[in-house]
Amino acid sequence: MEEKTHHHHHSTNKHIPSSKSRTPLLHKPYHHHVQTNPPPFLLHPSSHQNLNLVASNLPSSYYYYYYCYFYSQFHNSLPPPPPPHLLPLSPPLPPLLPLPPPHSMTRFHKSLPVSQVVERKQQHQQKKKIQVSNNKVSGSIAIEEAALVVAKRPDFGGQDGSVIYLLANHFLVKFDSSQRIYHYNVEISPQPSKEIARMIKQKLVETDRNSFSGVVPAFDGRQNIYSPVEFQGDRLEFFVNLPIPSCKAVMNYGDLREKQPQKKIEKLFRVNMKLVSKFDGKEQRKEGEDWAPLPPEYIHALDVILRENPMEKCTSIGRSFYSSSMGGSKEIGGGAVGLRGFFQSLRHTQQGLALNMDLSITAFHESIGVIAYLQKRLEFLTDLPRNKGRELSLEEKREVEKALKNIRVFVCHRETVQRYRVYGLTEEITENIWFPDREGKYLRLMSYFKDHYGYEIQFKNLPCLQISRARPCYLPMELCMICEGQKFLGKLSDDQAAKIMKMGCQKPNERKAIIDKVMTGSVGPSSGNQTREFNLEVSREMTLLKGRILQPPKLKLDRPRNLKESKVFKGTRIERWALMSIGGSSDQKSTIPKFINELTQKCEHLGVFLSKNTLSSTFFEPSHILNNISLLESKLKEIQRAASNNLQLIICVMEKKHKGYGDLKRISETRIGVVTQCCLYPNITKLSSQFVSNLALKINAKIGGSMTELYNSIPSHIPRLLRPDEPVIFMGADVTHPHPFDDCSPSVAAVVGSINWPEANRYVSRMRSQTHRQEIIQDLDLMVKELLDDFYKAVKKLPNRIIFFRDGVSETQFKKVLQEELQSIKTACSKFQDYNPSITFAVVQKRHHTRLFRCDPDHENIPPGTVVDTVITHPKEFDFYLCSHLGVKGTSRPTHYHILWDENEFTSDELQRLVYNLCYTFVRCTKPISIVPPAYYAHLAAYRGRLYIERSSESNGGSMNPSSVSRVGPPKTIPLPKLSDNVKNLMFYC
């Protein structure tokens, strides 16, 4: 039986020499007989078909390799070179027998005492990275910034599970690292749009080829040009006279009546180019390192080169490209169209540089007149052409400004190449607007357009568009058109989002075919001249790799796939509840008694007690109550008083989705202190069994119950690290930000923490508002401290380990998040005497574009439990892709887990098993979800906080003065309303 090893932070083994790296010395370059780390045959055993091993030489090479490994771990040095007859002719291990992970040696060689030395040494090396200051400054712990290194992979990948062969949408990029690249800075005046800038570059290449040494350079459309050869001079200046198509059309109340013949206006541009740097891609390793990424500037240059061809032919939005030539363009309503495109990104992987290519769908503004656009976008303006004299109320004006702000338009009353950005609306209606001319004489805007352009403005009572941030500059709405190629701003409606989702909901074989077509098509990254000129070769075949399918855990539920005969593991008792009907026809309202009966029966069947009678008769309210906050609050208080201020639940049946939903939640959870469950009349009228079951499960989860539990507790799955008597807390964190172009609303951070062990399926949450678009969680130390307090109250112990899952962090923010948020967690722990738990900090990424496809021809999604941690993952750091859910529609998207810090020293198998098992513990579902529950709960809680903020700010209104477009000073952070004590420890956000 293995000896228990307690992983305390202060544990050290002074007789073991320290090392600069956790990487075994054997894997560092050493003369001629040791492989560099990671040995490619260990990472990609299936890819080596020509091992050329001599049978007689295999055993000696094999055992010498293990001898080197244990010698290096015990002596902290390498053994002397072996005799010549023991030198391996090729990789010394058989292709399917990888080296055991370092700190799991006890499972393979229990008789070797060196295994304990290896484990303790690695524990010491990992934990010494944090230096705890004895002098507490401002209540925080000092963490040496230089010591914070992102966790390295602890082994060569997991071994558990059955093998599955997969294709990944990563395409290998081969390049000549000695190829020199010349970087030039470009300045164009007057400053053009991206489209015009590319036209300028194209004309220069055609007319002045000698200046560019006969090559076609790559241009990012802004200020950077990359060339495979040096131009004729370090500084170049050109003057380009470019004929630019003008925009003019005759308007008929917002619709194009006829398009004028397109004319071209000559415009002169000055182009200055300056050589900034020249570099190549040779690896720049630091002394003692066996791997280093390519220089960032080289990666950026390669990325621009590979984007050159699609940028010439498509509209680029971020890292994605869209074109109507790809098909799939579809109106989605509300003045928007869905457009199909593709995403591409260059990534460092274990197999080398790879191009991640995927299908992308997004919404664009429809290129129509502003009046026609508003008719489609805003329901209250559908009759605008028939009611030209209509004025806007203050609320309607606010909605119009919200719909148009930051959209680019062009005018249709004159020839022009100019585009304008909408910054707001005028205070006055068009009829009342006057403006000064160059001589200071005031002119009436309507008279000006009639005298100069012969156009009589029709919509006199609408405001004008304000098209300058700094000074008054107005355009009548009816004379403006929406420019093409603009991504839809703001939040899509539920109907629009559903249509976009449907456009992107391709079966795996369909998605794969689209990606393959892009790679071989004319808009693909390898179809232009740049790849040839820069000596690049992009594979047109997806990456073949081996994944593994993990075994699902057994649950404490008889039939997890059939709710008809199953009961929840923990059912709650709901004795005091009420029902509130908001809106609805008389026929819909008549279904309420049947709905109550069906719901109570279903709850009883599931093991949830819901009293068959509400505390009072149903409260029927008109739908406009959701528009009146004070009236809504008064009614909710009345319902609470009817229950003697002891209500557990209010079920709210609504006629349709309404923005007042946010007010209902905020008032109920912060002012009244009661959990609510909302549903729609169309659903309760149909009253399907599945709908009622899901509703009952949500209610049970919110009031304190849970659907299921792991049959074998979490510690039993990882006995090396976890024990029932040493509790562990699982935490999740997320930050939500305002919609694009909202430049003042605060961001909302949420942190959740488990409060039971070893079940670990009940969570409490904490939410805070913070600085506008601040990704780092500012009050993390306070929230973690509160969650640890809650854990202690529930479990009577502080957790020995903290497993922290952080959602919503991009790769560029990894080090900053690790540095600041790990410090915050440590600071929270320091508030407790002699408390120093082991911490694992993992980032959870769902918004990525890696997709995995089966190799077999059945075209189904990959099965739940599919994990990949080789070939397409990071070359050195600890990450893996896990598809934990069953993909029913579209193509499954695996979740990417990247471990930034690991004092618990998980092996790949252990952490993957833990995450997969946790995905079965979601509180209101019997099937595994796609993302680890703590991260998902944090996302839901942050969204709830965002709802509070948005409704509060909308209720307070805003200034319509165009001068307010230029905000002075930093935006104020609106504090979140405090949760009621009755609600804050419940999972009300589920």
UniProtKB/Swiss-Prot annotation:
Start and end residues of each Piwi domain: 649-950
Belongs to which family?
Answer: Belongs to the argonaute family. Ago subfamily.
- Which residue windows does the record flag with biased composition (Basic residues)? 1-13
Q: Keywords on this record?
A: Plant defense, Repressor, Ribonucleoprotein, RNA-binding, RNA-mediated gene silencing, Transcription, Transcription regulation, Translation regulation
Q: Where is the composition biased (Polar residues)?
A: 954-966
Q: Where is this region: Disordered?
A: 1-25, 953-973
Q: What does the record give as the function of this protein?
A: Involved in RNA-mediated post-transcriptional gene silencing (PTGS). Main component of the RNA-induced silencing complex (RISC) that binds to a short guide RNA such as a microRNA (miRNA) or small interfering RNA (siRNA). RISC uses the mature miRNA or siRNA as a guide for slicer-directed cleavage of homologous mRNAs to repress gene expression. Required for the processing of 21 nucleotide trans-acting siRNAs (ta-siRNAs) derived from TAS3a transcripts. Associates preferentially with the microRNA (miRNA) miR390 which guides the cleavage of TAS3 precursor RNA.
For this UniProt entry, which residues form the secretion signal? none
Cited CDD domains: PAZ_argonaute_like, Piwi_ago-like
Per its record, how is this protein called by name?
A: Protein argonaute 7
Ranges where the PAZ domain occurs: 379-484
Effect of inactivating the gene: First leaves are elongated and curl downward. Increased number of hydathodes per leaf. Accelerated appearance of abaxial trichomes. Presence of stigmatic tissue in the middle of the septum at the apical end of the carpels.
Biological process, per Gene Ontology = defense response to virus; lsiRNA processing; miRNA-mediated gene silencing by inhibition of translation; miRNA-mediated post-transcriptional gene silencing; regulation of development, heterochronic; ta-siRNA processing; vegetative phase change
This entry's Gene Ontology molecular function terms read:
RNA binding
Q: Which SUPFAM superfamilies match?
A: PAZ domain (SSF101690), Ribonuclease H-like (SSF53098)
Q: Which Gene Ontology CC terms are recorded? A: cytoplasm; cytoplasmic ribonucleoprotein granule; ribonucleoprotein complex
Which InterPro entries would you find in this protein's record? Answer: ArgoL1, ArgoL2, Argonaute_N, PAZ_dom, PAZ_dom_sf, Piwi, Piwi_ago-like, RNaseH-like_sf
Q: Which organism is it from?
A: Arabidopsis thaliana
Domain of life assignment: Eukaryota
Q: Which Pfam families match?
A: ArgoL1 (PF08699), ArgoL2 (PF16488), ArgoN (PF16486), PAZ (PF02170), Piwi (PF02171)
